[in-house]
From Swiss-Prot:
Keyword Iron-sulfur assigned: no
Protein name: Large ribosomal subunit protein uL29
Organism the protein comes from: Sorangium cellulosum (strain So ce56) (Polyangium cellulosum (strain So ce56))
InterPro entries recorded: Ribosomal_uL29 (IPR001854), Ribosomal_uL29_sf (IPR036049)
Gene giving rise to this polypeptide: rpmC
Family: Belongs to the universal ribosomal protein uL29 family.
MF (Gene Ontology): structural constituent of ribosome
Amino acid sequence: MKAKDLRERTTEHLRELEKSLAAGLFEARFKNFTNRLNDTATIRKAKRDLARVKTILTQRARAEEKA
């Protein structure tokens, strides 16, 4: 997921995506713990995507405070 694409989405959609990514990250960590995860890079990708979404949400919240 690219930050440019995420910025085009609505805030509500980003919040839903944040919940989805957090659940996916939890599931990937659980699978890794039980040795059922084949591609451990999915954890890293999920963490970074979640961070991108949270960053954009924070930027929007701060922009609303200033306005």
